[in-house]
Curated annotation (Swiss-Prot):
Protein name: Aspartate--tRNA(Asp/Asn) ligase
Record Gene3D superfamilies: Bira Bifunctional Protein, Domain 2 (3.30.930.10), GAD-like domain (3.30.1360.30), Nucleic acid-binding proteins (2.40.50.140)
SUPFAM superfamilies named in the record: Class II aaRS and biotin synthetases (SSF55681), GAD domain-like (SSF55261), Nucleic acid-binding proteins (SSF50249)
EC number per UniProt: 6.1.1.23
Organism from which the protein derives: Cereibacter sphaeroides (strain ATCC 17025 / ATH 2.4.3)
Gene Ontology MF terms: aspartate-tRNA ligase activity; aspartate-tRNA(Asn) ligase activity; ATP binding; nucleic acid binding
Reaction catalysed by this enzyme: tRNA(Asx) + L-aspartate + ATP = L-aspartyl-tRNA(Asx) + AMP + diphosphate
Length: 591
C-alpha cells in the first residue's frame, strides 16, 4: 500500500465495502455526536466521511484534530444505511471506519474558515490566499482555468498551429500602457522591459517563415486596476498567421473560442453566428466598442425631430457643428417612476440628466406622450419619434445630446442599466460580435494625433489613406466582444516599412525614433516580410465569463489587490542597499 493513500477522497464507493484503505487529506469538518466522531476528510478530488467510535484505536487521537489539519487515516470501508446515503458526494454511499491516524501537519487557528463560502474581506483572502484557494468555489475556478488552457492548446494544435515561446526580458516599446522596467546589472544605466505582449516577436516569427504560431503568453502592463483587468500581469492566447486577411483570422480563431464556450459554458447557449459590427455603428447603437448583445436595445439618432423644436436646450445644441441627439428606447419602461430612476442614474454618471418621453393610452383611448420633452416638442414630433423607434403603449425613450464623444460612453452604460432594470437582458447565453473598422488614430487629451489601438496595424487603403486626414483613416483592427467584455483584440499587420514610417510619423514619431524603438522588426521587414495578422484572447476574462464571476481576481491563482500589491508575498518590496549598488541605482525620495 502507498505510504500516504490507497485511494483519493473522491474514489471510494459501494464496490469497496470491506476493503482496508489509507486516505490522506485535510480535515474539512469535525462533528462529535456523543461518543461518535464524524470527520469530513478532503483532498483535491473530493470528500470522504470518516467515523470513529470509542472502540476505535484511533478515537483518542481523532478527538484532538482540528479543521485544516493534514492527516492520514487507515480504516475499513463501510456501506451507509440507505437513509444516510449522501447523494451530494461522490463517496456518499460509504464511510471509512478509522483504525489508525497519523498527523502529517497541524494547523494554527484559522484567520478565515475553509468550510463554507462565507465572504471575507479581500485583504484577508489575499493575505491567506493558500487558505482561500482551498474553498470549493475558488478551487473549482482554478481547475476550470487549467482545463480551459489545456483545451485551448489542444484546439490550436488540431487547427495546425505551432506553439513557440518568446522572450520575457526584452526592450521597451510603446504599446498603450506603461512598461515594467528591469535594470541591467551588466549594462549600468540601461533597462530591459517585461513585454506588454509578444507583439514584435510573433511578427518576427512570421518573417522567419513559420506559418501559424500560438502561445499561452504572460503579458505585463503597469495599468490601473478594474474588475475585469489585473493591474500588473495577465495571460493571453497569442496568435499570428502568415498570408491572411481579416476574415481568415476570424475563420481560424472563431471555432476555437466557440468550442471553449460550448465545452465549459455549463449548457449556456453559444450563438453560431457572430456578426461583424463596424466600430462607429457599435458606438452609435450600443455606446460601447464591446457591446452586450444580450440586451436588445439599439440606440438611434433622432436629431431631426428636435431641430427647431420647442425644446430649446436640444434645438440650440444642434446649431453647433458635430452635435446630435440620440434616443435610447426602453420597451416596457413607460412609467414616471422608472424614468425618474434612470434620470438619477444618468446624474450619478456625471450628466445633468436624461430627457425622456413615455407613451400611454389617454382617456379617449388614443396614444399619448408624457414627460418633460413631450410637452415642449408637441404631439407630431413625439409621434414621429415613437414610430421611428418602434415603440408603443407602456414604452419609453431617453435622450442625450451633444458631441457624441462626450456622451457615448454614458449612453452605453445607461443602455445596459435600462436593459437590466427592465429584465430585457437575456440570461444563460453568450453573445459574440466582431467589432471591425476601428479608427487608426484619435486625438489624445492634449489634442495631438495618436494611435487609437495597435500601432502595428495596416491602414485600410495603404499609403494613399495616410495622405489625407488621419482621423478618417480606418485600420485593419478588430476586437471580439462577448456579453459586454472585450475577449480578443487583433489586426492585420503593417509589414511594409515605408507605410510603417508614415503611420508613425502621423502620430508624432520621427523615422529615427521608429528605427530606435523597433529597429529589429523594421530590419526584418526589409528582407522579405509576408502579409500577416493575428490576435490575442484574454484567458483571464474568458475564464471569468465561464465561471460567472464578476471580478477577475476570482479566476487568478495569486492575484494582486486593487493597489497592485501582493499581500501574501509582500510585493512590491524595498531592495537592499547591496542590490541597489550592484545595479548602480539609488532611490529618490518623493517631494
Amino acid at each position: 500500500m502507498h505510504a500516504y493513500r490507497s485511494h483519493t477522497c473522491a474514489e471510494l464507493n459501494a464496490g469497496h465495502v470491506g476493503q482496508e484503505v489509507r486516505l490522506s487529506g485535510w480535515v474539512h469538518r469535525v462533528r462529535d455526536h456523543g461518543g461518535v466522531l464524524f470527520i469530513d476528510l478532503r483532498d483535491h478530488y473530493g470528500i470522504t466521511q470518516v467515523i470513529a467510535d470509542a472502540d476505535s484505536p484511533a478515537f483518542a487521537e481523532l478527538e484532538t484534530v482540528r479543521a485544516e489539519w493534514v492527516i492520514r487515516i487507515e480504516g475499513r470501508v463501510k456501506g451507509r444505511d440507505a437513509a444516510l446515503v449522501n447523494p451530494k458526494l461522490a463517496t456518499g454511499e460509504i464511510e471509512v471506519y478509522a483504525t489508525g491516524l497519523t498527523v502529517l501537519g497541524a494547523a494554527d487557528e484559522l484567520p478565515m474558515p475553509v468550510f463554507g463560502e462565507v465572504d471575507y474581506p479581500e485583504e484577508t483572502r489575499l493575505t491567506y490566499r493558500f487558505l482561500d484557494l482551498r474553498r470549493e468555489k475558488l478551487h473549482a475556478n482554478m481547475m476550470l482555468r487549467s482545463n480551459v488552457v489545456r483545451s485551448l492548446r489542444n484546439r490550436m494544435w488540431d487547427a495546425g498551429f505551432n506553439e513557440f515561446q518568446t522572450p520575457i526580458i526584452t526592450a521597451s516599446s510603446p504599446e498603450g500602457a506603461r512598461d515594467f522596467l528591469v535594470p541591467s546589472r551588466l549594462h549600468p544605466g540601461k533597462f530591459y522591459a517585461l513585454p506588454q505582449a509578444p507583439q514584435q516577436f510573433k511578427q518576427l516569427i512570421m518573417v522567419a517563415g513559420f506559418d501559424r504560431y500560438f502561445q499561452i503568453a504572460p503579458c505585463f502592463r503597469d495599468e490601473d486596476p478594474r474588475a475585469d483587468r489585473s493591474p500588473t500581469d495577465f495571460y493571453q492566447l497569442d496568435v499570428e498567421m502568415s498570408f491572411v486577411e481579416q476574415e481568415d483570422v476570424f475563420r481560424a480563431v472563431q471555432p476555437v473560442i466557440r468550442g471553449i464556450f460550448e465545452e465549459f459554458g455549463g449548457g449556456r447557449r453559444v450563438d453560431a453566428d457572430w456578426p461583424r459590427i463596424a466600430y462607429r455603428d457599435a458606438m452609435l447603437w450600443y455606446g460601447s466598442d464591446k457591446p452586450d448583445l444580450r440586451n436588445p436595445i439599439k440606440m438611434q439618432v433622432v436629431s431631426e425631430h428636435f431641430r427647431g423644436s420647442g425644446f430649446a436646450i436640444f434645438a440650440k445644441l444642434l446649431e453647433n457643428e458635430g452635435t446630435e441627439i440620440r434616443a435610447i428606447p426602453a420597451p416596457t419602461g413607460g412609467s414616471r417612476k422608472f424614468c425618474d430612476r434612470m434620470n438619477a442614474f444618468a446624474q450619478s454618471q456625471g450628466l445633468p440628466g436624461m430627457g425622456y418621453i413615455f407613451w400611454r393610452k389617454g382617456d379617449d383611448g388614443a396614444m399619448e406622450a408624457a414627460g418633460p420633452l413631450a410637452k415642449n416638442i408637441g404631439p407630431e414630433r413625439t409621434e414621429a419619434i415613437r414610430q421611428q423607434l418602434g415603440l408603443g403603449e407602456g414604452d419609453a425613450a431617453f435622450f442625450l445630446g451633444g458631441k457624441p464623444e462626450t456622451f457615448e460612453a454614458v449612453a452605453g452604460r445607461a443602455r445596459n442599466e435600462i436593459g437590466r432594470e427592465l429584465g430585457l437582458t437575456e440570461e444563460n447565453c453568450f453573445r459574440f460580435a466582431w467589432i471591425v473598422d476601428f479608427p487608426m488614430y484619435e486625438k489624445d487629451d492634449e489634442g495631438k494625433v495618436d494611435f487609437s489601438h495597435n500601432p502595428f496595424s495596416m491602414p485600410q487603403g495603404g499609403m494613399a489613406a495616410l495622405e489625407g486626414d488621419p482621423l478618417k483613416v480606418l485600420a485593419y483592427q478588430y476586437d471580439l466582444a462577448c456579453n459586454g467584455y472585450e475577449l480578443i483584440s487583433g489586426g492585420i499587420r503593417n509589414h511594409k516599412p515605408e507605410i510603417m514610417f508614415k503611420a508613425f510619423e502621423l502620430a508624432g514619431y520621427p523615422a529615427s525614433e521608429v528605427e530606435k524603438r523597433f529597429g529589429g522588426m523594421v530590419k526584418a521587414f526589409r528582407y522579405g516580410a509576408p502579409p500577416h495578422g493575428g490576435c490575442a484572447a484574454g484567458i483571464d476574462r474568458i475564464v471569468m465569463l465561464l465561471a460567472d464571476e464578476a471580478n477577475i481576481r476570482e479566476v487568478i491563482m495569486f492575484p494582486m489587490n486593487q493597489r497592485a500589491e501582493d499581500l501574501l508575498m509582500g510585493a512590491p518590496s524595498e531592495p537592499t542597499n547591496e542590490q541597489l549598488r550592484e545595479l548602480r541605482l539609488r532611490v529618490v525620495p518623493k517631494d
